[in-house]
């Protein structure tokens, strides 16, 4: 998900007439008090009331096509106005503030894991909506499934992250092999620099990017994501025990050498633009950015480079998970409409077109044959099918992860913190993780 912008955008999308009673039949996966919901709609139609559905998310990609999708939903639901707030920077803080003030959105998005769990007590349990649940891949649904069997969120799309490189730039520089160590990556950087290309454009201004980057070097593949986090929380492992942690600082030293202080000044959009236009060769990002890359450089050929965290190909990491889950406020006055909205966005053909064309991502549903066309999601599928991906650590951590570790990494890049300072900061974070 990722996903982050430096602005808060609120858009209200409206239609004019009244809510159609016949729409429910088309949404066969919707359950609940159908007759009472239809009666309410009929009464509102007589009274000329407009229903406002409040939606909150932290998206930064595919926004324009999402707005078009919402307009279609409104057209199919006369009398319904979807009021959506895109809070792509500090989304967790803004959503928490709304919840604390009693202004809870009807539908809200969170990253699966710690982010979504914060709102389970407010969330509708989908576990009895069997027809709807059958439309999603089981592995994706399990991300919000509790030990008791409750399901508090519906999955959006799969997202994969690693280093992303411009294939044309690599070809022009004569680079034919991807690196299997930080040292080999350093040699590639030298070659790129000698060809007049900035080797790495790291969005170091973004704490979330830095936090995600660090997880590649935290990952212990023998434990996968959950096992690694649990071992660090319990004290069974320390950062000195992690097989590739020291190489994280070798990687950051490359960034310091080839990107300098500029790294902590660069946001996600300028970094993506630099790689899309060939000004830079690599950055750390996910396939959620494919639509932006396509817009910035329509003919640019991109691919994933598994992060060379160790000394051999089998050590390399590429991390994949579901980016966002849709949660519905269980006490929403528009509960059935909110459920219909989620099903429409996530399972309809219109929704599938948005996910595969507007965002260029792989849907977590099993109801469409549509697939993304971009280089990155297609490349990601190869790694996923080959079993060469690991899960996400940052979403298992609590929502303070990026805000805690991001400044530590920025401080190292600026020469303000030592390797020992940063490592101690990470140690303290995981020891205090609940």
Language model segments and positions:
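Extracytoplasmic "Venus flytrap"/periplasmic binding protein-like
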Residues: 72-139, 168-180, 281-282, 303, ...
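Short, low-complexity disordered leader/linker segments with a strong preference
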Residues: 1-53, 75, 428-434
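Extracytoplasmic/periplasmic substrate-recognition and gating elements
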Residues: 71-76, 81, 149-150, 173, ...
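Glycine-centered hinge/linker elements that transmit conformational signals in sensory
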Residues: 191, 233-264
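C-terminal capping/gating helix-and-loop segments adjacent to ligand/active sites or protein-protein/ligand interfaces
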Residues: 83, 232, 320, 358-369, ...
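Periplasmic solute-binding protein
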Residues: 118-122, 141-178, 197, 204-233, ...
């Amino acid at each position: 998900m990722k996903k982050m912008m430096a602005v808060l955008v609120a858009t209200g999308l409206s239609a004019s007439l009244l809510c159609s009673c016949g729409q429910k039949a088309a949404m066969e996966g919707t359950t609940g008090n159908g007759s009472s919901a239809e009666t309410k709609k009929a009464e509102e139609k007589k009274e000329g009331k407009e229903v406002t559905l409040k939606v909150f998310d932290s998206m930064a990609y595919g926004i324009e096509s999402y707005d078009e999708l919402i307009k279609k939903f409104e057209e199919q639901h006369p009398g319904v106005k979807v009021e959506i707030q895109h809070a792509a920077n500090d989304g967790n803080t803004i959503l928490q503030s709304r919840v604390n003030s009693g202004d809870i959105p009807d539908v809200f998005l969170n990253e699966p894991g710690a982010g979504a769990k914060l709102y389970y007590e407010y969330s509708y349990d989908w576990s009895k909506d069997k027809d709807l649940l059958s439309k999603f891949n089981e592995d994706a649904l399990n991300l919000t499934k509790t030990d008791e069997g409750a399901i508090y969120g519906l999955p959006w799309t799969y997202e994969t992250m690693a280093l992303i490189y411009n294939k044309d730039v690599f070809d022009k520089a004569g680079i034919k092999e991807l690196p299997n160590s930080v040292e080999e990556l350093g040699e590639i950087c030298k070659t790129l620099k000698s060809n007049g290309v900035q080797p790495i454009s790291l969005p170091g201004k973004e704490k979330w990017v830095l936090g995600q980057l660090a997880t590649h070097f935290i990952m212990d593949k023998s434990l996968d994501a959950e096992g690694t986090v649990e071992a660090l929380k319990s004290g069974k492992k320390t950062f000195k025990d992690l097989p590739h942690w020291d190489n994280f600082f070798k990687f950051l030293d490359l960034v310091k050498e080839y990107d300098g202080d500029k790294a902590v000044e660069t946001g996600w959009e300028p970094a993506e633009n630099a790689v899309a236009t060939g000004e830079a060769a690599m950055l750390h990002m996910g396939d959620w950015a494919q639509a932006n890359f396509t817009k910035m450089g329509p003919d640019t050929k991109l691919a994933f480079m598994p992060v060379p965290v160790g000394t051999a190909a089998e050590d390399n990491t590429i991390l994949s998970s579901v980016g966002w889950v849709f949660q519905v406020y269980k006490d929403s006055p528009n509960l059935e409409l909110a459920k219909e909205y989620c099903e429409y966005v996530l399972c309809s053909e219109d929704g599938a077109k948005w996910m595969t064309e507007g965002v260029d991502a792989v849907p977590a549903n099993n109801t469409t044959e549509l697939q993304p066309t971009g280089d990155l999601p297609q490349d990601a599928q190869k790694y996923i099918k080959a079993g060469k991906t690991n899960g996400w650590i940052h979403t298992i951590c609590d929502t303070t992860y990026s805000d805690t570790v991001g400044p530590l990494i920025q401080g190292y890049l600026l020469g303000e913190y030592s390797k020992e300072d940063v490592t101690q900061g990470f140690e303290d974070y995981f020891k205090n993780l609940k």
